[in-house]
Protein backbone atom coordinates (compact mmCIF):
# COMPACT_ATOMS: atom_id res chain seq x y z
CA UNK A 1 0.00 0.00 0.00
CA UNK A 2 1.35 3.39 -0.97
CA UNK A 3 2.34 5.41 2.10
CA UNK A 4 1.11 8.87 2.94
CA UNK A 5 3.67 11.38 1.71
CA UNK A 6 4.17 14.72 3.42
CA UNK A 7 6.30 17.44 1.89
CA UNK A 8 7.20 19.81 4.71
CA UNK A 9 8.59 23.31 4.92
CA UNK A 10 6.92 24.55 1.75
CA UNK A 11 7.23 28.23 0.83
CA UNK A 12 6.56 28.59 -2.89
CA UNK A 13 3.58 27.92 -5.16
CA UNK A 14 5.81 26.01 -7.60
CA UNK A 15 6.86 23.47 -4.97
CA UNK A 16 3.32 23.12 -3.67
CA UNK A 17 1.92 22.61 -7.15
CA UNK A 18 4.45 19.90 -7.95
CA UNK A 19 3.88 18.14 -4.63
CA UNK A 20 0.16 18.07 -5.33
CA UNK A 21 0.67 16.94 -8.94
CA UNK A 22 2.78 14.02 -7.73
CA UNK A 23 0.23 12.95 -5.15
CA UNK A 24 1.38 14.38 -1.83
CA UNK A 25 -1.19 13.48 0.82
CA UNK A 26 0.04 16.16 3.25
CA UNK A 27 1.74 19.53 2.85
CA UNK A 28 3.44 21.16 5.82
CA UNK A 29 4.09 24.77 6.77
CA UNK A 30 6.60 25.58 9.49
CA UNK A 31 5.89 28.25 12.07
CA UNK A 32 9.18 28.18 13.96
CA UNK A 33 10.97 31.48 13.42
CA UNK A 34 14.51 30.12 13.71
CA UNK A 35 13.92 27.75 10.81
CA UNK A 36 14.97 28.68 7.25
CA UNK A 37 11.61 27.16 6.30
CA UNK A 38 9.63 29.57 8.47
CA UNK A 39 6.65 31.19 6.79
CA UNK A 40 4.24 33.88 7.95
CA UNK A 41 0.77 32.48 8.71
CA UNK A 42 -1.03 34.82 6.30
CA UNK A 43 1.23 33.83 3.39
CA UNK A 44 0.90 30.15 4.29
CA UNK A 45 -2.87 30.51 4.20
CA UNK A 46 -2.75 31.93 0.68
CA UNK A 47 -0.29 29.31 -0.59
CA UNK A 48 -2.37 26.50 0.90
CA UNK A 49 -5.52 27.34 -1.04
CA UNK A 50 -4.80 25.06 -4.05
CA UNK A 51 -4.29 22.14 -1.68
CA UNK A 52 -7.63 22.32 0.08
CA UNK A 53 -9.58 19.17 -0.58
CA UNK A 54 -6.58 17.57 -2.29
CA UNK A 55 -4.07 17.13 0.55
CA UNK A 56 -4.08 17.57 4.31
CA UNK A 57 -2.69 20.95 5.35
CA UNK A 58 -0.37 20.64 8.34
CA UNK A 59 0.73 23.43 10.68
CA UNK A 60 4.09 22.60 12.27
CA UNK A 61 4.67 24.35 15.59
CA UNK A 62 7.18 24.15 18.43
CA UNK A 63 5.83 24.80 21.94
CA UNK A 64 3.48 27.50 20.64
CA UNK A 65 1.62 30.00 22.77
CA UNK A 66 -2.16 30.11 22.58
CA UNK A 67 -1.94 33.44 20.76
CA UNK A 68 0.38 31.93 18.14
CA UNK A 69 -1.92 28.97 17.62
CA UNK A 70 -4.96 31.25 17.41
CA UNK A 71 -3.32 33.20 14.58
CA UNK A 72 -2.09 30.13 12.71
CA UNK A 73 -5.41 28.29 12.92
CA UNK A 74 -7.33 31.42 11.90
CA UNK A 75 -5.16 32.27 8.88
CA UNK A 76 -4.06 28.83 7.65
CA UNK A 77 -7.13 26.79 8.58
CA UNK A 78 -5.04 23.62 8.87
CA UNK A 79 -6.37 20.09 8.85
CA UNK A 80 -3.74 18.88 11.33
CA UNK A 81 -1.55 20.42 14.03
CA UNK A 82 1.95 18.93 14.22
CA UNK A 83 3.47 19.50 17.65
CA UNK A 84 7.26 19.40 17.45
CA UNK A 85 8.11 20.63 20.95
CA UNK A 86 7.92 19.32 24.50
CA UNK A 87 4.14 19.35 24.74
CA UNK A 88 2.87 17.11 27.55
CA UNK A 89 -0.01 14.67 27.04
CA UNK A 90 -2.22 17.04 29.01
CA UNK A 91 -1.24 19.95 26.79
CA UNK A 92 -1.97 17.90 23.67
CA UNK A 93 -5.47 17.18 24.99
CA UNK A 94 -5.98 20.87 25.73
CA UNK A 95 -4.92 21.88 22.22
CA UNK A 96 -7.21 19.27 20.66
CA UNK A 97 -10.13 20.52 22.74
CA UNK A 98 -9.45 24.19 21.94
CA UNK A 99 -9.20 23.82 18.18
CA UNK A 100 -11.06 20.62 17.38
CA UNK A 101 -8.18 19.47 15.19
CA UNK A 102 -6.25 16.19 15.11
CA UNK A 103 -2.72 16.32 16.47
CA UNK A 104 0.41 14.66 15.16
CA UNK A 105 2.96 14.50 17.99
CA UNK A 106 6.63 14.45 17.08
CA UNK A 107 9.31 12.52 18.95
CA UNK A 108 12.97 13.24 18.29
CA UNK A 109 14.95 10.00 18.32
CA UNK A 110 18.59 9.07 18.80
CA UNK A 111 18.41 6.16 21.27
CA UNK A 112 15.79 3.75 22.60
CA UNK A 113 15.38 5.95 25.67
CA UNK A 114 13.96 8.69 23.47
CA UNK A 115 10.96 6.47 22.74
CA UNK A 116 9.98 5.79 26.35
CA UNK A 117 7.62 8.77 26.35
CA UNK A 118 5.55 7.47 23.44
CA UNK A 119 3.29 5.23 25.51
CA UNK A 120 1.92 8.18 27.49
CA UNK A 121 0.58 9.72 24.27
CA UNK A 122 -1.10 6.62 22.84
CA UNK A 123 -4.81 7.33 22.57
CA UNK A 124 -4.15 11.06 22.94
CA UNK A 125 -2.19 12.05 19.85
CA UNK A 126 -3.93 11.05 16.63
CA UNK A 127 -0.69 10.15 14.93
CA UNK A 128 3.01 10.11 15.73
CA UNK A 129 5.97 11.33 13.74
CA UNK A 130 9.45 10.05 14.50
CA UNK A 131 12.29 12.35 13.50
CA UNK A 132 16.03 12.28 14.14
CA UNK A 133 17.14 14.17 17.22
CA UNK A 134 18.91 17.38 16.32
CA UNK A 135 22.71 17.36 16.52
CA UNK A 136 24.36 19.32 19.30
CA UNK A 137 24.44 23.01 18.53
CA UNK A 138 21.48 22.96 16.17
CA UNK A 139 18.60 25.29 16.96
CA UNK A 140 16.26 23.35 14.68
CA UNK A 141 14.22 20.49 16.17
CA UNK A 142 13.85 18.99 12.68
CA UNK A 143 14.89 19.43 9.08
CA UNK A 144 18.55 18.77 9.83
CA UNK A 145 19.03 16.18 7.10
CA UNK A 146 20.07 13.37 9.44
CA UNK A 147 18.55 9.94 10.03
CA UNK A 148 18.31 7.69 13.07
CA UNK A 149 18.46 3.93 13.55
CA UNK A 150 15.10 2.79 12.19
CA UNK A 151 15.39 -0.55 14.02
CA UNK A 152 14.59 1.38 17.21
CA UNK A 153 10.98 1.43 15.98
CA UNK A 154 10.74 -2.35 15.63
CA UNK A 155 8.71 -2.69 18.86
CA UNK A 156 5.86 -0.63 17.44
CA UNK A 157 3.04 -2.84 16.21
CA UNK A 158 0.70 -2.15 13.32
CA UNK A 159 -1.90 -0.52 15.57
CA UNK A 160 0.31 2.53 16.09
CA UNK A 161 0.00 4.95 13.21
CA UNK A 162 3.13 6.96 12.55
CA UNK A 163 5.05 8.90 9.96
CA UNK A 164 8.80 8.53 9.54
CA UNK A 165 11.04 11.55 9.08
CA UNK A 166 14.68 12.45 9.44
CA UNK A 167 17.09 12.62 6.55
CA UNK A 168 14.84 10.88 4.05
CA UNK A 169 15.75 11.34 0.40
CA UNK A 170 15.47 9.58 -2.96
CA UNK A 171 18.37 7.27 -2.10
CA UNK A 172 17.14 5.89 1.23
CA UNK A 173 13.35 6.17 1.23
CA UNK A 174 12.82 2.70 -0.26
CA UNK A 175 14.99 1.15 2.46
CA UNK A 176 13.13 3.14 5.11
CA UNK A 177 9.78 1.80 3.95
CA UNK A 178 11.06 -1.78 3.96
CA UNK A 179 12.59 -1.55 7.43
CA UNK A 180 9.73 0.18 9.24
CA UNK A 181 5.98 -0.11 9.59
CA UNK A 182 5.55 3.56 8.79
CA UNK A 183 2.27 4.34 7.08
CA UNK A 184 3.61 7.74 6.12
CA UNK A 185 6.87 9.47 5.26
CA UNK A 186 7.84 13.09 5.75
CA UNK A 187 10.53 14.87 3.73
CA UNK A 188 11.92 18.38 3.88
CA UNK A 189 15.68 18.77 3.44
CA UNK A 190 15.73 15.72 1.16
CA UNK A 191 14.03 17.72 -1.59
CA UNK A 192 16.05 20.92 -1.17
CA UNK A 193 19.07 22.43 -2.91
CA UNK A 194 19.75 24.56 0.19
CA UNK A 195 18.00 24.93 3.57
CA UNK A 196 14.49 26.15 2.85
CA UNK A 197 14.88 26.04 -0.96
CA UNK A 198 12.68 23.29 -2.40
CA UNK A 199 13.58 21.79 -5.77
CA UNK A 200 10.80 20.73 -8.13
CA UNK A 201 13.21 18.25 -9.74
CA UNK A 202 14.11 16.72 -6.35
CA UNK A 203 10.44 16.45 -5.44
CA UNK A 204 9.97 14.47 -8.66
CA UNK A 205 12.94 12.24 -7.85
CA UNK A 206 11.61 11.55 -4.35
CA UNK A 207 8.18 10.54 -5.63
CA UNK A 208 9.79 8.41 -8.34
CA UNK A 209 11.76 6.56 -5.66
CA UNK A 210 8.65 5.96 -3.55
CA UNK A 211 6.72 4.69 -6.57
CA UNK A 212 9.56 2.34 -7.54
CA UNK A 213 9.69 0.99 -3.99
CA UNK A 214 5.94 0.47 -3.98
CA UNK A 215 5.76 -1.22 -7.39
CA UNK A 216 6.97 -4.72 -6.28
CA UNK A 217 4.47 -4.68 -3.42
CA UNK A 218 1.65 -3.79 -5.80
CA UNK A 219 2.77 -6.44 -8.29
CA UNK A 220 2.92 -9.19 -5.68
CA UNK A 221 -0.56 -8.31 -4.45
CA UNK A 222 -2.15 -8.33 -7.90
Curated annotation (Swiss-Prot):
Per the UniProt entry, the Enzyme Commission number(s) are 5.3.1.24
Show the CDD domains listed in the entry: PRAI
Q: Which residues form the signal peptide?
A: none
- A Gene Ontology molecular function term of the record: phosphoribosylanthranilate isomerase activity
- From the UniProt record, give one GO term of the biological process aspect: L-tryptophan biosynthetic process
The reactions it catalyses are: N-(5-phospho-beta-D-ribosyl)anthranilate = 1-(2-carboxyphenylamino)-1-deoxy-D-ribulose 5-phosphate
The alphabetized UniProt keywords are: Amino-acid biosynthesis, Aromatic amino acid biosynthesis, Isomerase, Tryptophan biosynthesis
Reading the lineage from the top rank, the first entry is Bacteria
Q: Which Pfam families match?
A: PRAI
Q: In which pathway does it act?
A: Amino-acid biosynthesis; L-tryptophan biosynthesis; L-tryptophan from chorismate: step 3/5
NCBIfam families xref list:
PRK01222.1-1 (NF002295)
User: What family, per the record?
Assistant: Belongs to the TrpF family.
Q: What is this protein called?
A: N-(5'-phosphoribosyl)anthranilate isomerase
Q: What is the lineage of its organism?
A: Bacteria, Pseudomonadati, Pseudomonadota, Alphaproteobacteria, Hyphomicrobiales
Gene name, per UniProt, is: trpF
